[in-house]
Amino acid sequence: MPRTDDDSWEITESVGATALGVAAARAAETESENPLISDPFARVFLDAAGDGMWNWFAAPNLPAQIAEAEPDLKPRMQGMVDYMAARTAFFDNFFLAATHAGVRQVVILAAGLDSRAWRLPFEDGTTVYELDQPRVLEFKATTLAEHGARPTCHLVSVPVDLRHDWPAALRQAGFDAHAPSAWSAEGLLPFLPAAAQQLLFERVQTLAAPGSRIAVEAPGPDFIDEAARERQRQTMQRVRDLMADLEPDRDIPDVQDLWYFEEREDVGDWLGRHGWDVTVTPAPELMARYDRRPPHDIEDAIPQTRFVAAQRTERTRPDR
């Protein structure tokens, strides 16, 4: 279903369902022979959400009819598991390095089913602010509480739509804009229109004191490439048609319907112009760093993203 300006969602629908797909990839990596990351809560979320296409990433085998008709699908899905593992490790290491360096405020934008507040060994005195749709945060908190999970930090949930006045909600929740903070935008930007992305970083700029850090998964220059999008859409449509024959009542959403394919400013360039020291790593390079590689013989096997890490150095004080 196409996006609207004020749409909202449960965890099993629309944008929420994509968080389950990511959790399934983390579960698959966690349960693999040589896992790069460990997320013991990913499987908990999947079990709580019930059956859905998101479980394909965490299942050992695809339905035989689909595997035979689409032989590239299994290696393509493994490529995405490897991509998600490298992505997760990148953000894990970013937050641990920031808190080890003395940052005690962590802000996770569009937190989804991110479980870092429960699984990372944050330094004493760290506060983690999670921002997302109210029903998504409620599902996560309820599910983890039912399994006896306890945060490893001071956790503050901020139920707010990032298209609304989230800076005010963050401040009201106790965030101190005059102390350094560490921010993440993981799996977020494609779901925002270009203007909303611009506003997001302008707002972060007003809240991030000198010494703050930010990590971003950013669309690469080929994000709006029409040919690549069409290839991906055709592959997805074939899978949907096959799945409709197997399970007529199950709809498989196309993530492209949830993304905004618009020209947008390069994140690294924007941060660099606004007083941040920036490092940009293309996705294949990041995966290689963690000894993971996309399938070499499958086109468009992983998102052509860039991973941006930056630290604010200029001395302009944030807005009051």
Curated annotation (Swiss-Prot):
Superkingdom classification of source: Bacteria
Signal peptide limits: none
Name of the protein in question: Putative S-adenosyl-L-methionine-dependent methyltransferase MAP_4078
Residue sites binding S-adenosyl-L-methionine per the record: 132, 161-162
Record carries keyword Signal: no
Gene Ontology biological process terms in this record: methylation
UniProt GO MF annotations: methyltransferase activity
Family label: Belongs to the UPF0677 family.
Role this protein plays: Exhibits S-adenosyl-L-methionine-dependent methyltransferase activity.
Record keywords, A-Z: Methyltransferase, S-adenosyl-L-methionine, Transferase
Pfam families for the chain: LCM
The protein's Enzyme Commission number: 2.1.1.-
Stretches the record annotates as Disordered: 294-320
